[in-house]
Amino acid sequence: MSIQKLNDTTNSGYVSSEETDSLLVSSSNPSKGGGRTALLRQVKSNSTNGPTTGASTSSSGSVSGGGGGSGSGGGSASGSAAGASKPTLMRQDRTSTYLTSPQQSQHARMGSEESMRGGASGAAGHDEDVEQGLVRSSIVPDIEVHEEDQEQHSQQLNATTMATMTNNQQQQQPTISIMNLSLKPGDSHSHSSSPGSHPNLGTSSYQNLASSIPPSVPSRCRACRNCSRRASTTPTTLIDRSASRDSVKSAFQQGNLSGSMAICISNSALPQQQQLQQQYHLQQQQQQHYQLQQHHLHQQQLQQSQQQVPPVLITSSPTNGSRIIRQSSQPESSSTAICCGPHSACVGHAHSHSHTVPNVSLKQLRESSGDGIAGIAADSLRINGGMRPFKQLRKPASTLSIPGSMKTPSIANREQISSGCNEEAAEALVGIHSDYPRYEMYMEERALTGGNTSRKPSTNSAKHKPNVGYRLGKRKALFEKRKRISDYALVMGMFGIIVMVIENELSSAGVYTKASFYSTALKTLISVSTVILLGLIVAYHALEVQLFMIDNCADDWRIAMTWQRISQIGLELFICAIHPIPGEYYFQWTTKLANKNKTIGTEMVPYDVALSLPMFLRLYLICRVMLLHSKLFTDASSRSIGALNRINFNTRFVLKTLMTICPGTVLLVFMVSLWIIASWTLRQCERFHDEEHANLLNSMWLTAITFLCVGYGDIVPNTYCGRGITLTCGMVGAGCTALLVAVVSRKLELTRAEKHVHNFMMDTQLTKRLKNAAANVLRETWLIYKHTRLVKRVNPGRVRTHQRKFLLAIYALRKVKMDQRKLMDNANTITDMAKTQNTVYEIISDMSSRQDAIEERLTNLEDKMQSIQEHMESLPDLLSRCLTQHQERIEQRRNFLHPDTAAVAPIQAPTPQSMFNAAPMLFPHSS
């Protein structure tokens, strides 16, 4: 094994300049192998997202060909024998090189099976052109690394040229061979003699690629030959870093060459300018050969249908062995070679592979969205898997609600998943209602880079998106619809009750019988209204379920069907379904008459009585309508405030607010309605057995007496139906009486303003009484003193009278003081607490302002202390300079006065420490 550095021009589109410095090449001993090359290594490993392969093997790969041209022919034969092999890419010391397939056992000096396929197996159906096999699942075009001398290479080129010209109409799989030629002395110019010595370089395949492609040679896309896309082997050494994509593209279009031409340049000491001139002549010859064979290649492209698997890239390091680098960010899928532009060369692809889905990553590659240097860097990152981590930046915030089949799509369901959509990342676990469109979900990236997320609408998508604004609008529309349906239900319920009352009153008055047409017509009308009412109730609860689904992001209406909701719906339907049916039906009703000496009475009673009374239960719809029409329920601001305070807006809350706002009106309406309904129902139950109850006024008297909890007992119910109604009236009446007392007491209570006025007036009166009582005490004291001390004759009766008044004045004074204390205690209301709070706030504000002033003074003091400290720190230096100057002046004066001491060494400047620690200095005086 020998390691040689290739030229700078060997840089491919996917290999950096650092990687080309350590390409491993293998050169066999000329004495043993006759200058034949040996493959370094044949590695067969698993791709990170492709099928597994066998273990890695290595073989010499050299076959004696018999002469200069037989070697090339032998290579072709051995290459065709392993047409189904899976070549891999080996990476040594950060160097990406393509090696031959691990299943090949013998190779010619020019290396790969596809390079010689035209000479040995051109008619085989397993071969495919590069346009159809570029992006397959697991096979990659080969790159062989060789090192040979110039004589053997010239023989091989001649043999290869003959094989290529003979089979130029057959399809050839692209193969790139990178070789480092060792020239002998004197043969340095043998490789650049004339363009005619390399007739095979103008073919349309990638065969016989020797050495590296210089930067001046434009290379085309391997998928289609007529576009200006850079192939993976396009050199980038001489491209200026500031060059744009258009400039690079125009430079590539000048040669109009295919991406499969090979140029052999000797590794000699030729100047670079001469090499470039030789390459230009070779390009002209290659262009002519390419134009002759292009027509035949297009015909062959239409006949090829075999598909291959995408290439596998394997890198290895000389220290830690081989490791797998992911080339693509998706599972394997059947895809076609992507054409870089819409031209005639790509007709075969669109015709033969119309059923496949183009690769999204290659679509990105042909989008003109960057310059040449950026495209080269992106290609390198894609091949080496460096773009894989950036895929996470385009994923949703959460994938908990995304099904597993959508997270990791397989080959079978990839197209179905690409046409559908995943769940929203922020979506609730219960999903979104099916009536509303789901968001256009992020698709799984299918490109080498992770791809751009393609958005496609769902099959169940509507014309609106279920965002927050749409949901709020839909919720508001459902609220309005629910309110209208509730109003209609109340109207139909009240209509049925009114018709029922009319029918019973007409039949009880003897206007018609139950068997008459009028009775049947009215009952039929009641039945029709009942059916409509049941439908409205079902529609109301359907809207309730839809609102629940919108509020909770539910996807299935059965989620909202709890046992409580089902029971409520069933109970409402049962209550509203009860009504008198058309026809004449009677039953025998036997009861004990309490008003007639407890005799037993039996009467034939129609079923309409038992079916009519429960119809009054439909009045519960009034509470629902009150709730839906309440300003507290319909106003958005009140609902927002209630939601912030965790208040549930239901019928109970609305009734409480009504009792707070207008308690007297609500209580009066309720009591009067209950009184009328109870009186009519009691009359219907009792009129068949007792004539007294046939009169509505008697029933109203009994109901009122029972309602007020008086109970005279002059009229009593006989049937159990009447007794039950009376019992209900008594219980409800007790509650209404308590409510009436509460309402009256609240009405009689003083308001806060009235309380303040009353307290002020009472305080004024008590103050006056206190002054009067004090004055009376003083007056009686003076009178007692007067009648006992200032008179000549003391009158005991008058003295006792004034003493009695004196004590009464003292008692009055004490009582006034006690009343003042009670008034002060009662005056401690919320307003007084507010005053106290204001006082405390003022005190705290004053303390806060003082504290701020103290902090400001402390800050100023700290600044001053810091400045003093800085001056103190600079003081030693200043003293040192002053003392030094003073010492110098003293020395000068001493030298001037005493010249004999001038020979003494100059004194160094004292340090601050030495100055403070030194002994006192004695200065001489001049005499």
From Swiss-Prot:
Signal peptide: none annotated. Keywords: Calmodulin-binding, Ion channel, Ion transport, Membrane, Transmembrane, Transmembrane helix, Transport. GO terms for cellular component: membrane; neuron projection; neuronal cell body; plasma membrane. Residues 696-716 dip into the membrane without crossing it. One of its GO terms (biological process) is potassium ion transmembrane transport. Residues 1-31, 95-107, 200-214, 314-336 have a biased composition (Polar residues). Residues 763-839 are annotated as: Calmodulin-binding. Residues 45-62, 219-232, 296-308 have a biased composition (Low complexity). It is found in: Membrane. Residues 63-77 have a biased composition (Gly residues). The chain crosses the membrane at residues 489-509, 530-550, 569-589, 609-629, 658-678, 724-744. It comes from the Eukaryota. The keyword Glycoprotein does not apply. Pfam families: CaMBD, Ion_trans_2, SK_channel. It is a multi-pass membrane protein. GO terms for molecular function: calmodulin binding; photoreceptor activity; small conductance calcium-activated potassium channel activity. Residues 1-131, 181-251, 296-336 are annotated as: Disordered. Changing residue 785 to C: In RNA edited version. Belongs to the potassium channel KCNN family. SK subfamily. Heterooligomer. The complex is composed of 4 channel subunits each of which binds to a calmodulin subunit which regulates the channel activity through calcium-binding. Forms a voltage-independent potassium channel activated by intracellular calcium. Activation is followed by membrane hyperpolarization. Thought to regulate neuronal excitability by contributing to the slow component of synaptic afterhyperpolarization. The channel is blocked by apamin. This is Small conductance calcium-activated potassium channel protein. The lineage of its organism: Eukaryota, Metazoa, Ecdysozoa, Arthropoda, Hexapoda. The gene is SK.
